[in-house]
Amino acid sequence: QEPDNAAFFCSVVRYASLNDHSTGALYSPDLSEVILCNKLPSCNQAFIGRKDEIKAIASHLSNQSVLFITGMAGIGKSEVAKAYAQTNRKKYTNIIYLYYTGDLRKDIANLTFADDSVEMNEEVRFQNHYKVMQRLHTDTLLILDNFNVLPKDEPFLKELMKNNMQLLITSRCKLKNYDSIEIKELDKEKELTELFYKHCPSAKRDPDSVSAII
């Protein structure tokens, strides 16, 4: 009888830890030892500014679960997404980073889970991984980076968006039917100048030339 009692109490503790009964909120299981080799990439050391954009992302995700970060190539979409995640890390039980390669199901299958085995084919891995993802809630952030296709061209995106976790998606595409925030050029007078000095500190001696360059 003792093993049964132990299992019962373990289940009760787990249920209580994953649910906030005072607010009705549901919490995700901690996947830090489930998904392996999925550390959030660090921001570029030269990253500056974008405080307003990061605040706008936080404001949106407090009310809606999906947001696209759009903008031209090289403007800093991925860096903003990573900066948001790092700034708000304490809000989340899990932060999952997924680099889109053109097939969302394959990208999910190619995540490394602790219980993967060499006998599993791609479809089995996908099914196992996605079952775990379906148990996640709004305290999990999934960053889908490099999603440079229209949503209609990725069949699995709508299915992924049905889940309860938060999705932050970077894309070069201009989208009309989805909530998005566009990343624009840095402020010339302040942020671009600061970025220039980070790459070329000696230029501080000649601010007029720097101003002419940028």
Where are these regions (language model features)?
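Short amphipathic recognition helices of helix-turn-helix/homeodomain-type DNA-binding modules
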Residues: 1-31
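Conserved adenine-nucleotide phosphate-binding loops and their immediately adjacent elements
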Residues: 9, 24-59
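A short acidic, amphipathic alpha-helical/loop segment
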Residues: 34, 80-84, 154-159, 212
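Post-nucleotide-binding-loop coupling segment downstream of the phosphate-binding loop, primarily
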Residues: 46, 52-60, 65-137
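Alpha-helical sensor/transducer elements of the RecA-like P-loop NTPase core
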Residues: 79, 109-111, 159-212
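Conserved ATPase-coupling elements of RecA-like P-loop NTPase cores
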Residues: 147-157, 178-179
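Conserved P-loop NTPase "ATPase switch" module shared by AAA+ and STAND
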Residues: 133-152
